[in-house]
Amino acid sequence: MFSNIIEIIILSIVQGISEFLPISSSAHLNIVEIIFEFNSNSLMIDVSLHLGSLLAIVFYFRRELLDLRNNQKLLSLLIIGSIPIVIAGYVISSTGLVNLLENNLKIIAWTTLIFGIILYLADKSKFDKKISSNLNFKTILYIGLFQILALIPGVSRAGITITAARLFRFNRFDSSKISFLLAIPAIAGASVLQLKNAIGQSFELNYLVLISITLSFLFSYFTVKFFLDYINKFSLNVFVIYRIIISIILFIIIYN
């Protein structure tokens, strides 16, 4: 029991911190599970980890989400931008392709490195477009298509959507805001698919589910708050450097 609680605490903290930073939550969860040899295969725990993050981002942007009732254009843009990841996620989940990508340290190492470099290149330019006057259907669709790459562990959903938004000349804060708003349907869709697969599982671990939702919520919420404050003042270089360090460590583990 105690080991299960420790495992859930670690996974919840990792999920909460890494979900909304451009460092890939799926990669970090895979790495932690492999290194610490966690053996929990409960899909309900996976659902609860994502549910905590989903509740956090919804709570943080609650005013913006309520304002969507009076901003039909932004609502339509978010729907358009979410269609690609919803379709791709369903296809990959239903065909079993997701199993080929999970727990593959080589894939994680290479994607962490490559997409970290791409993030650096996209963030170098001093663009200053704002969502309010420059986000259109074509742009959000392209960003949504980029988001499909996040299905590969190590790419990072936040990282690739921020990268795409920066490539379309949005400033760092608005690029991050686009990323976080697109995260809501993406995480919700992933949770629905996981919940569908979890139907029929035993619910003996309800207390672990409660712990994982609570911790994931708290760490996700404060990570979003920290990141948006940080991105107003600094570049994304620290996350690029972090990704490079992680990829080097993974390459050492793999090839030694």
Curated annotation (Swiss-Prot):
It is a multi-pass membrane protein. It is found in: Cell inner membrane. Its main location: membrane. It catalyses: di-trans,octa-cis-undecaprenyl diphosphate + H2O = di-trans,octa-cis-undecaprenyl phosphate + phosphate + H(+). One of its GO terms (biological process) is cell wall organization. Its EC number is 3.6.1.27. The chain crosses the membrane at residues 5-25, 41-61, 74-94, 100-120, 135-155, 180-200, 208-228, 234-254. Keywords: Antibiotic resistance, Cell inner membrane, Cell membrane, Cell shape, Cell wall biogenesis/degradation, Hydrolase, Membrane, Peptidoglycan synthesis, Transmembrane, Transmembrane helix. GO terms for cellular component: plasma membrane. The keyword Membrane applies. It is an enzyme of class 3 (hydrolase). Pfam families: BacA. One of its GO terms (molecular function) is undecaprenyl-diphosphatase activity. InterPro entries: UppP. Bacitracin is thought to be involved in the inhibition of peptidoglycan synthesis by sequestering undecaprenyl diphosphate, thereby reducing the pool of lipid carrier available. Belongs to the UppP family. Catalyzes the dephosphorylation of undecaprenyl diphosphate (UPP). Confers resistance to bacitracin. HAMAP family: Undec_diphosphatase. This is Undecaprenyl-diphosphatase. It comes from Pelagibacter ubique (strain HTCC1062).
